[in-house]
Structures are given as C-alpha cells and as structure tokens.
C-alpha cells in the first residue's frame, strides 16, 4: 500500500479531551474519529487492526469447534420481558418503537435471541453439545462515555453461547472456551489475568473475567505473588487476621454519644478501637425487604457479595428518612438490639468472636456498650460480606493481596438454566424426559481489546503493535523521493515482502514528518531507504530498538522472516 493514497489523517497535537493513552494514540494516528459521544468511525488504519483481530478470533473459534452466525441488532422488547431482564437493564438499554407502537431495543447482548432460536430448534440430547458465536456491533447508552473505545455507546463484541445436555458438557465447553480465549489474547499480544468475577445482570453463578492490567483501567483486580489467586475486587476474598482475646461478658449499658456521626468520632469519644465497634447498615432490598447488615467497623460492606447472598435484583442503603420511620434513630443510631422491624439480620464473619462491643442503641445520639452476640442481639446468618483490602492475606496461600487497575476484555459465564427455563428451551434426554437446556455465555469486547493492546504497548511517541494485529507488518520509508536509486530499491522491497502487508511511504514529506507518522503506525519492522541505497544498505528499526541498525539488502529476508514468521 502506498502511503500517498492511504487515508491516514494524523494529528500533531493530542486532543485535550483524550485522557487515556490509547485514545490519544488512536486519534493522533488517524485510527478513529469521534462521530458523537461514545461513537466512533474506524478509519482505514483502525479498521485494518480491527479486521486482523477478528480474523484471529474466527480462527481460534473454529479450532475450538464454535460455529459463527449473526443475529439482528434490533430486537423485540417482549423477548427480554420473557427472560425477566428488561427491568434489570435500566437506562443503558437503547429503546425505540416501530411505527405500530411495538417496543423494540438495540441489543447490548443476545442471550435471549440465541435461546429463542435454540428453543425452536433443539429437541433432543443428540443435538448437543452445541456452541455458537457472532462478532457484531452492540449498543449501550452509557451515561459517561470516556477513554475512547474503552467505554463507548457503540462497540464491536464477540458474544458466544453454548448449549449442553448435562453439567459435564457445560463444564467442558466452558474450559474449551477459556482455552480459546487465552489463545486469542496471546496472539493479539495482550497480557491478561483470568479472575473470579460477578455475573451481574447476565445471570448464573459462576463466571471468569479476563482482565488486562493497565493504568487507565476501570476495574481493580486482587492477586497474590505466586499466581494462585486472582479475583475482581468486587468478588475478592481475604483472610481476616484480627483476633480478639476472649474476655468476661459485661453488662450491656446505654451511653449518650452526642455528635458522633462517624466511626472515627465514635471511637475517639468512647476511647475504643474500631475493631470493638459493630456498625449496622440498613439496606432496602428489591424496594420492599428490610435487611440489617452487621460488620466490624474497621471494614466496609461489599454490596456485590451482599447481592449474591440475598439473591436480589436491587439493594440500596436506607435513606435517613427510612431510618427514622422504621427505627426512630437517625444515621449512626441504628442497631441490632431488639431490631424486630428488620425482615432479616445478616452479619459479616468479622462479627463472630467479638466480646463487649459497641452497637447502635436504636435511637439518635446513643449507643450500647458491652453488647454481645447471641446474648443481646442475633444474626440470622453469617457470610463474607466485606471488601478485601490490599495487603491482607489471600485465601489460598495467605500471601499479601496486590491490587492492580485493569481493563475487562473478556467474560465467560456458566448460566445454567437461567434463560432456558423461563424461555422454554427444553430437550428430551436419553430416557425421553423433558429437561431444560444448560447454557453458557462468552464474550470478548473486540474494540475494547484494541485499546487494551495500545495501553500495554504504547511507546513514547506512538505504539508498537504486536505482529499479528499490526496494521502493517513492514513500513518502508524512502528519504528522497526524487532519488531514482532509492525509488527502485524501495519498490523492489515493497514487491518482495508484499505478503507481510507493506506500507510504503512514498510521500514528498520531510523526514521528521515521515518518522513521526511511522511511530504512530507502529509496524513491527521499519525499513528506511536512504543515502546508502546505492550500496545495497538500508536501516532497519523495531519499535523496541533504541537506534536503527544498518543491514545489507541481501540479509533482509532472513531478518524479516525471523521477526514476522
């Protein structure tokens, strides 16, 4: 490809609103252009990277026995009503009506659509296992689109779905998809960590995220040094090392605590450590159930874990008005003693083994001291409900947890029968008995993956693309376009190495302009044809090299084959 005819509108200055490095590089290099907030055009350079990435996905999916198809972008809302997900998705769903007033939506994901097809087609266990996928543009009405392709309102995604007649089949499908995803990420050059994750609105109980460490990441992952534990912070578990020595139970006593509207103020006023205070947090669950959560005051409630425990669609911390109406106490005064108004009391495991603690007295500006579990208050059940902290021991090898910001580039789920039971996807088993199909769901954010690659492979002046997804494998730069010897050599090299996808800079531009643009193209090999062309010598530079090296043209073939084959 001749650069003189290749549409690559580069920018000299970094746009002020581009915060992420990947966003800056893609704008400056002419990979993408914003159409509106969260919506981008993929210019030729960006589209080449996108298509090469999709080709890798297609190859690895085929190797894993996953079959490609395509579903419509516009879906009937009735399908999402049937699955029960429509009210859960909230304002991120793009909704519209057709001319007949029928509710429609733009698909953010396609579990319902695939399940509907399968429900009408799969009738016997003999038709399974089955694995399908598509690569398609998705839509989400993000409240704050940002960081370029990392959080957009329109994006390209691989979404796949598996259908099994048994749990054993699903387990194998899940493992096969995980292995295929790791191969995809390796070939695209992105470092990822598979981590324990929350399934969110997708349904199901078991899921793994593929997280790419990056400074601009919106997620945080918790890992240990030996690599035996990795989890999204939302689901991370740590070992609580605090232990209170057993002591004689004292008589519970109510004390006034005026102005103590925080744990720090309360601890200072009563001259006790936060570890001797049990805070009570009232949650309104699914807008009807009142659940009081107890946790040691030096810890914070993990609401994702709480959602899993309660198996609810929504929860929120009660407003001050709710507290006053239900308990007669304002913020800080709510407590578990005589809390008959609560539908359920759940406690974090940190509450066990505490003696003579401070709890809310059920009225404003008052606390009970020397309160004790079982004697003075109770909990209906205990669970790990706390946010893990960096440095705490992991639950596997008891090594200190390390927190890293990261980008979620993939997510796989064991959905079970979450969708198939509600949507009637059943089959006849070997005994002729009707059973719900067992599902898995699998996704890669393809355009987000491109941003993650740039975040990890950014250079001082551009990007060093991994060889399999680089827009061009070789970038030939001719220094003087009027020099016939240089032109002849550059054209010969372009033809000889055409299979590596060559970009030939044949523009009448200053060397500085050409080299600056070359940094943004980020080809694995840059060949400069200059003053030594008459002697059969060129300069070769890889993105990681400090300086270019001179190389005889006769040695180029072996050098390039070693780098790119």
Swiss-Prot record:
Compartments reported by the entry: Cytoplasm
One Pfam family matching this protein: tRNA_edit
Chief location category: cytoplasm
- Specify the superkingdom: Bacteria
EC class of the enzyme, as a word: ligase
* A biological process from GO: prolyl-tRNA aminoacylation
Stretches that traverse the bilayer:
none
Reactions catalysed, semicolon-separated, are: tRNA(Pro) + L-proline + ATP = L-prolyl-tRNA(Pro) + AMP + diphosphate
Query: Any idea which GO molecular function terms this record carries?
Result: aminoacyl-tRNA deacylase activity; ATP binding; catalytic activity, acting on a protein; proline-tRNA ligase activity; transferase activity
Keyword annotations from UniProtKB, A to Z: Aminoacyl-tRNA synthetase, ATP-binding, Cytoplasm, Ligase, Nucleotide-binding, Protein biosynthesis
What Gene3D superfamilies does the annotation carry?
Anticodon-binding domain, Bira Bifunctional Protein, Domain 2
Signal sequence interval, chain numbering: none
Against InterPro entries, the record matches this protein to: aa-tRNA-synt_IIb (IPR002314), aa-tRNA-synth_II (IPR006195), aa-tRNA-synth_II/BPL/LPL (IPR045864), Anticodon-bd (IPR004154), Anticodon-bd_dom_sf (IPR036621), Pro-tRNA-ligase_IIa (IPR002316), Pro-tRNA-synth_IIa_bac-type (IPR004500), Pro-tRNA-Synthase_IIa_type1 (IPR023717)
Disulphide bridges, residue numbers: none
| One GO cellular component term noted in the UniProt record for this chain | cytosol
Q: Does the keyword ATP-binding apply?
A: yes
Q: Which EC number applies?
A: 6.1.1.15
Q: Which family does it belong to?
A: Belongs to the class-II aminoacyl-tRNA synthetase family. ProS type 1 subfamily.
The entry's function note states: Catalyzes the attachment of proline to tRNA(Pro) in a two-step reaction: proline is first activated by ATP to form Pro-AMP and then transferred to the acceptor end of tRNA(Pro). As ProRS can inadvertently accommodate and process non-cognate amino acids such as alanine and cysteine, to avoid such errors it has two additional distinct editing activities against alanine. One activity is designated as 'pretransfer' editing and involves the tRNA(Pro)-independent hydrolysis of activated Ala-AMP.
Question: Subunit details for this protein?
Answer: Homodimer.
| UniProt remark on domains | Consists of three domains: the N-terminal catalytic domain, the editing domain and the C-terminal anticodon-binding domain.
Question: Which protein, by its recorded name, is this?
Answer: Proline--tRNA ligase
Q: Which source organism does the UniProt entry give?
A: Lactobacillus delbrueckii subsp. bulgaricus (strain ATCC BAA-365 / Lb-18)
């Amino acid at each position: 490809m001749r650069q003189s005819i290749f549409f690559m509108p580069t920018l000299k200055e970094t746009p002020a609103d581009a915060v992420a490095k990947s966003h800056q590089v893609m704008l400056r290099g002419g990979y993408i252009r914003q159409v509106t907030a969260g919506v981008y055009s993929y210019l030729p350079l960006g589209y080449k990277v996108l298509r090469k990435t999709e080709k890798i996905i297609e190859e690895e999916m085929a190797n894993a026995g996953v079959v490609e198809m395509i579903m419509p972008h516009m879906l009937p809302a009735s399908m999402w009503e049937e699955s029960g997900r429509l009210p859960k998705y909230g304002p991120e769903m793009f909704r519209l009506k057709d001319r007949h007033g029928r509710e429609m939506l733009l698909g953010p994901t396609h579990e319902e659509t695939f399940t509907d097809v399968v429900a009408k087609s799969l009738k016997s266990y003999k038709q399974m296992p089955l694995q399908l996928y598509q690569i398609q543009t998705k839509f989400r009405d993000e409240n704050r689109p940002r960081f370029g392709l990392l959080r957009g309102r329109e994006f390209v995604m691989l979404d796949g779905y598996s259908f099994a007649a048994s749990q054993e089949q699903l387990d194998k499908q899940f493992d096969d998809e995980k292995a295929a995803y790791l191969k995809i990420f390796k070939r695209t050059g992105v470092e990822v960590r598979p981590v324990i994750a929350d399934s969110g609105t997708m349904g199901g109980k078991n899921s793994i995220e593929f997280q790419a460490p990056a400074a601009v990441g919106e997620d945080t992952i918790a890992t240990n040094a030996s690599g035996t534990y990795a989890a999204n912070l939302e689901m991370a578990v740590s070992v609580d090392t605090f232990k209170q020595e057993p002591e004689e139970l004292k008589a519970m006593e109510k004390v006034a605590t005026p102005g103590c509207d925080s744990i720090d103020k309360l601890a200072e006023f009563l001259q006790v450590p936060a570890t001797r205070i049990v805070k009570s947090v009232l949650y309104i669950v699914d807008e009807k159930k009142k659940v009081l959560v107890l946790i040691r005051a030096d810890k914070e409630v993990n609401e994702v874990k709480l959602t899993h425990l309660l198996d609810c669609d929504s929860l929120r911390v009660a407003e001050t008005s709710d507290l006053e109406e239900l308990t007669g106490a304002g913020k800080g005064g709510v407590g578990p003693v005589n809390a008959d108004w609560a539908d359920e009391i759940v406690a974090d495991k940190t509450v066990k083994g505490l003696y003579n603690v401070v709890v809310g007295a059920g009225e404003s500006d008052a606390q009970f001291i020397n309160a004790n579990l079982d004697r003075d208050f109770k909990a209906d059940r205990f669970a790990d409900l706390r946010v893990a902290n960096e440095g705490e021991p992991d639950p596997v090898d008891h090594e200190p947890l390390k927190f890293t910001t990261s980008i979620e580039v993939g997510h796989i789920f064991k959905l079970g029968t979450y969708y198939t039971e509600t949507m009637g996807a059943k089959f006849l088993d070997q005994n002729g008995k009707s059973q719900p199909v067992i599902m898995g769901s699998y996704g890669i954010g393809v355009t987000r993956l491109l941003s993650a690659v740039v975040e990890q492979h950014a250079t001082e002046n551009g990007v060093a693309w991994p060889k399999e997804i680089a827009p061009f494998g070789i970038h030939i730069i001719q220094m003087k376009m009027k020099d016939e010897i240089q032109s002849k050599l550059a054209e010969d090299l372009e033809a000889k190495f055409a299979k590596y996808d060559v970009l030939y800079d044949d523009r009448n531009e200053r060397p500085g302009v050409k080299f600056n643009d070359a940094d943004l193209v980020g080809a694995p090999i840059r060949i400069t044809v200059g003053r030594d062309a008459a002697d059969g010598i060129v300069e070769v530079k890889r993105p990681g090299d400090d300086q270019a090296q001179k190389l005889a043209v006769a040695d180029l073939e072996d050098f390039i084959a070693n780098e790119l084959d």
